[in-house]
UniProtKB/Swiss-Prot annotation:
PROSITE patterns linked: G_OBG, GTP1_OBG, OBG
Subunit structure: Monomer.
Domain of life: Bacteria
Functional description taken from the UniProt entry: An essential GTPase which binds GTP, GDP and possibly (p)ppGpp with moderate affinity, with high nucleotide exchange rates and a fairly low GTP hydrolysis rate. Plays a role in control of the cell cycle, stress response, ribosome biogenesis and in those bacteria that undergo differentiation, in morphogenesis control.
Family annotation (Pfam families): GTP1_OBG (PF01018), MMR_HSR1 (PF01926)
Binding site for GTP: 166-173, 191-195, 213-216, 280-283, 304-306
Gene Ontology molecular function: GTP binding; GTPase activity; magnesium ion binding
Annotated protein name in UniProt: GTPase Obg
One GO cellular component term: cytoplasm
Keywords annotated in UniProt: Cytoplasm, GTP-binding, Hydrolase, Magnesium, Metal-binding, Nucleotide-binding
Keyword presence, Lipid biosynthesis: no
HAMAP family named among the record's database cross-references: GTPase_Obg
Organism lineage: Bacteria, Pseudomonadati, Chlorobiota, Chlorobiia, Chlorobiales
Length: 335
């Protein structure tokens, strides 16, 4: 399935039905009073978060959503039917903005979360409401009110426990394919991963966490170089960053510093997230390789996804980090 993480749509709630002009017509009551019913309300438009959805692809093909119009009022004080509501499913992690104002309307985070995005118009009153002592046979009724109408911009930010960060060919796709059932494209050239991939990593005792493979960052990504900020935003919602540097990198410390700099330029708050560093591709490490000391308080592990080296220790540490975040996100945000 094609991955799409931004889309624009228009939504239109239903107009309210018009009120009815009607008079009682019964045997022996030749001049009955007004009995026009009210119009039904227009249908509302809702957004509903659905964890089964992973892309905004559907909105590339359908860009307009219109709820049903309210039914018109009838005689004998019968109200028109309410218009049919429209419920639009979106992936968890979708941020919705009003195109005209730029205002963020909602952030759809929880599965099943639902919000009314456009309210249907109120139905008009029938002529029964306008009878008075001096006007006993009103020959008018209210029209229905128009439903709300908006242009919306949607942006998907993937929700994962662990975000993989590294230059192209750091081994991110290989790692996620080994630890989970995800099957990203893997090849020995830069930018093999062109879209984010999500994988569920199974841990002991039926525990699991979600890992996101973000397309490779290059220097200048925050300014739009390479794949640019198109996918950097997907790191924002991750709880823990797993920064990956290959063992055969000429200057591991410099590459690590560059990755942190790109994250900081995009969003300084990313550096407050817990992070773990892994030196990858240990199966092809130089003979004189030594483990680097990169930053005080940041753990560094060595792995080889191909040889299976260090993967158990990595899963243990990632689970520890994710568990801390799940227990007390605010307390451990900078740990």
């Amino acid at each position: 399935m094609k991955f799409v993480d931004s889309a624009k749509i228009s939504v239109k709630a239903g107009d309210g039905g018009r009120g009815c002009v009607s008079f009682r017509r019964e045997k022996f009551v030749p001049k009955g009073g007004p009995d026009g019913g009210d119009g039904g309300r227009g249908g509302h438009v809702y957004l509903r978060a659905n964890k089964q959805l992973t892309t905004l692809l559907d909105f590339k093909y359908r860009k307009s959503y219109i709820a049903g119009r309210g039914g018109h009022g009838l005689g004998a004080r019968k109200s028109g039917k309410d218009g049919k509501d429209v419920i639009i499913g979106v992936p968890c992690g979708t941020v919705v903005r009003n195109v005209e104002t730029g205002e963020v309307i909602c952030d759809m985070v929880e599965d099943g979360q639902e919000i009314m995005i456009a309210k249907g118009g109120r139905g008009g009153w029938g002529n029964q409401h306008f009878a008075t002592a001096t006007r006993q046979a009103p020959r008018f009724a209210q029209p229905g009110e128009p439903g709300e109408e908006y242009e919306l911009e949607m942006e998907l930010k993937l929700m994962a426990d662990v975000g993989l960060v590294g230059f192209p060919n750091a081994g991110k796709s290989t790692l996620i394919s080994v630890l989970s059932a995800a099957r990203p494209k893997i090849a020995d050239y830069p930018f093999t991963t062109l879209v984010p991939n999500l994988g569920i990593v199974r841990y002991e005792d039926y525990k699991s966490f979600v890992m996101a493979d973000i397309p490779g960052i290059i220097e200048g990504a925050a300014e739009g170089r390479g794949l640019g900020i198109q996918f950097l935003r997907h790191i924002e919602r991750t709880k823990t960053l797993l920064i990956m540097v290959p063992s055969n990198t000429e200057d591991i410390a410099a590459e690590y510093a560059t990755l942190l700099k790109e994250l900081e330029k995009f969003d300084p708050s990313l550096l407050s997230k817990p992070r773990l560093v892994v030196i990858t591709k240990m199966d092809i490490a130089p003979e004189d390789f030594t483990m680097p000391e990169l930053e005080k308080g940041v753990k560094v592990l060595a792995i080889s996804s191909v040889a299976g080296q260090g993967l158990k220790a990595l899963k243990d540490e990632l689970w520890r980090q994710v568990s801390l975040q799940n227990q007390s996100p605010s307390e451990h945000a900078g740990s």
